[in-house]
Amino acid sequence: MIIGLGNDLVDIRRIEDSLERFGERFIAKVFTEAERATAERRSGRARSGAYAKRFAAKEALVKALGKDGVSWRDIEVANDGDGRPFLSLSGGAAALLARRIPAGMIARLHLSLSDDYPLAQAVVIVEAQPA
């Protein structure tokens, strides 16, 4: 059963501006250390695109679940061994997800990311499946 669907489109130039204007303060507020490490392995547009896709994924998840008690760093975007992106939740985000999933069900999160400068997009589906 679908619990929520979220989509977000980010102008990568807006993220570039935030990185330039606020630097470390912006990165520390929004991204986990692992997300930062992933983005910082890149340079130029690839770096800002990596940050923008992760920002879009966080926004898309909030649209799918809600924001109640969730901080940016409670939502982490990572990649599996094949490079597929996935979401890892902690803190307020994990608690909110647990409240949204009916008893006897388990949560499954689906994430798709895309970018084509100057845009980055994320789609998140929150699904509940029988345990």
UniProtKB/Swiss-Prot annotation:
Cofactor or coenzyme needed: Mg(2+)
Catalytic function, reaction form: apo-[ACP] + CoA = holo-[ACP] + adenosine 3',5'-bisphosphate + H(+)
Protein location: Cytoplasm
Keywords: Cytoplasm, Fatty acid biosynthesis, Fatty acid metabolism, Lipid biosynthesis, Lipid metabolism, Magnesium, Metal-binding, Transferase
Chief location of this protein within or outside the cell: cytoplasm
GO cellular component: cytoplasm
GO molecular function: holo-[acyl-carrier-protein] synthase activity; magnesium ion binding
EC number(s) reported in the record: 2.7.8.7
Superkingdom field: Bacteria
Segment forming the signal sequence: none
Binding, Mg(2+): D8, E59
InterPro entries assigned: 4-PPantetheinyl_Trfase_dom (IPR008278), 4-PPantetheinyl_Trfase_dom_sf (IPR037143), ACPS (IPR002582), Ppantetheine-prot_Trfase_dom (IPR004568)
Pfam families: ACPS
Enzymatic class: transferase
GO biological process: fatty acid biosynthetic process
Family in the record: Belongs to the P-Pant transferase superfamily. AcpS family.
HAMAP family noted in UniProt: AcpS (MF_00101)
Role noted for this protein: Transfers the 4'-phosphopantetheine moiety from coenzyme A to a Ser of acyl-carrier-protein.
Name of this protein: Holo-[acyl-carrier-protein] synthase
